[in-house]
Amino acid sequence: MSTIFALCTPWGKSGVAVIRVSGQDAVKTFMHFKISNAIKPRVATFTPLYNAAHEVIDEVIVVYFSAPNSFTGEDVVELHTHGSIAVIRMILCELGKIFIPAGPGEFSLRAFLNNKVDLTRAEAIVDLINAETEMQAKQAIRQMSGSLEKLYQSWRQQLIDVLSNMEAYIDFPEEVTSSAVENISFLLDKIKESLENHLNDGRKGEILRQGIYVAILGEPNSGKSTLFNHLAKRDIAIVSEYAGTTRDVLETHIDIAGYPIVIIDTAGIRDSNDPVEQEGIRRAKLKAESADFKIIMLPYEKKDALNNEIIDLIDDRSICVLSKSDSIITQNLININNINFIPVSVCCNLGIEHLLSAIQKKVEADFKFCSTSPFITSERQRVHIQNAVNILKNISFELPMELISEDLRLSVRELEKVVGVISNEEILDNVFGKFCIGK
C-alpha cells in the first residue's frame, strides 16, 4: 500500500499541529527533511526540519512508531510542529512530493485492515471524535474498549459451536437422536432470544449518540419560545406578544448532566384557518409523537381552562410546566386536575433548575445504562443483527441437516459483518467515509 500523510489536528492557528505519515516508506520522512538526529521508536526527538535549500522550516518533535506497534499497524511518523498555517502548508507541500495525501478515515481503515481494530471499535472512534457531552463520550469509550466486539464474537462462537455439532451429525448420521436435535434447537433458541433482547433496546444507544429530543409544546403565547431561548442561552426563536409567531420547528443542542439534549420549539397548537400556521401545527404534533420527551406548557393565567387538545398530549414522557408563574412564590409542584405542574417564570428565572432537574431524571431513568452496558449504536449494526435473527427464526428442523447448517452459516456471516471478520467495499466506505481526514 502507498505511504500516506495528513494533518491530524484541526486546520488553523494553534499551539501545536500534528502531521501523521503511515506506510512502509514512512521513515523516508527523516531523509527528506534532512533529520540528522538518530530517531528511535517510541521516543520523542526534538529536531529541525529542512527543505531542499537546507532552510529551516520549523523545529519540531518527531515520534516514530515501528510496525506493527502503531495505530495503523504500519510504520508511522508523527511530526509535532508549531501550529502556524504557513509551517503546516510548507510541511504538507514537502510530504506531497514523496507520499500520497490520505483520504477521510484512511488511517483508521488501515488499522482495521491490519487487525488493530474491528468495525465496532472503528465506529466508536468517530463517535468519540463527534461526542459533545460526557455520556456520549463514555458510550464511545466503552465501545472502543471492545464491549460490543466481545458480545458479538461470543454469539458468533456459540453459533459456530452448534454448527460444528451439526457438521458432525451430517458426517455420522447414525449418531443423530431426537435428544441431540432437541439440544441443538434449545441452544439456537437461547442464542436467538439473546439477540432479540439486544435488538429490543428502544434504540437507546443510537438516540444517545445522536441526541435526546425534547419537544416544547403548548398553546400559542404559552412561553414556549421564551423558554427555548433561555435554555439555548441565546436568541434563536422570535418572541412576540402576538399569537402564532412561531410557525416552523426550531432546534438547539444543550448539555444536561452530560446528556446530549436537543430542545425543539414548536408552533402553538390551536384551531387556525391560516394554511401556514396549520402546517406549523401539523409539524408540532408530529414532533410530539416522535420526541423522546415532551415539555407541556400551560400559562398560569389559563390554569383554570385546560385545553383538551393539550391535555391529550400528556403521557409518561411528559413534563408539565405552569409558565409565566411570576407571582407564585412556591417552587413546589402545583396539582391541576390531577396533573402535577412545575411553576416556571423565565423572566424572573424561577423554576428553571427544577425543570432541568425533572428533565435529567426522565433522561437518566431511560439512558443511564448506555454508558455502562453495550448497546447498538448504529443502523449498520442493527441491520446485520436483525438479519441474523430472521435467519434463525426461519430454521425448520423438518429440513435436512445440510440445509439447516447452511442457514447457520448465513447467520454467522451476518454477525461477522458487524465486527468486520468479513466485509466488502460498500460496508467499509459506509464506516470509514464518516471520518475526517487525518484519522
From Swiss-Prot:
- How is the cofactor bound here? Binds 1 potassium ion per subunit.
What's a GO cellular component annotated to this UniProt protein?
cytoplasm
Q: Which UniProt keywords apply?
A: Cytoplasm, GTP-binding, Hydrolase, Magnesium, Metal-binding, Nucleotide-binding, Potassium, tRNA processing
Spell out the molecular function terms from Gene Ontology: GTP binding; GTPase activity; metal ion binding
Name the Enzyme Commission number(s) assigned to this protein. 3.6.-.-
Q: Which family does it belong to?
A: Belongs to the TRAFAC class TrmE-Era-EngA-EngB-Septin-like GTPase superfamily. TrmE GTPase family.
Q: What name does this protein carry? A: tRNA modification GTPase MnmE
